[in-house]
């Protein structure tokens, strides 16, 4: 608690810490989804997996006990060595978090996750009503099944599971449903972020007044459901 208070005071004073609190490594920018808000195709970069040599070089430069998140514009679990990467980080004393779309490419993925030493997995999900944009014949029902299997299969006190939603205009009820869904299946935290419209100006997000109303109601729902709600931006 004292550390949190000090961190808050330092932020208010614009005091920059000597080291980052969290390190993000994009191990791939390839993905098995094509979400309309994703900027992956707009960046003009080659879509590829990070090599093992490059990954190990980055991790070896880090100090001890860092918070490492394996995420980026791609889906980490399609990287052929993702579990080797998780193990490599854990062997060096780091905490490891992964952000995933939940659309696993092989049946063994749930067990592979549960048998790995990953500390936290965050599933990006904007709706539980079938509104996700998926490709290649996949259905969003499979995403829900995978999320629920991970939550149900974890051992107490081990893997943390979060849901992360992006707030879109006129989709506040979808957010409320995600909060209720996460609480019902036993997730730990719901993260909510604003929609980035830099490359997608046609997409809409709530204005400031609408956001405030949504925030207040979402907080009320989260409290009533007994689940933590974090606003990322």
Where are the regions a protein language model picked out?
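Radical SAM enzyme [4Fe-4S]-AdoMet core and its adjacent flexible, acidic
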Residues: 26, 48-53, 92, 111-233
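Conserved alpha-helical substructure of the radical SAM core
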Residues: 1-120, 134, 141, 201-222
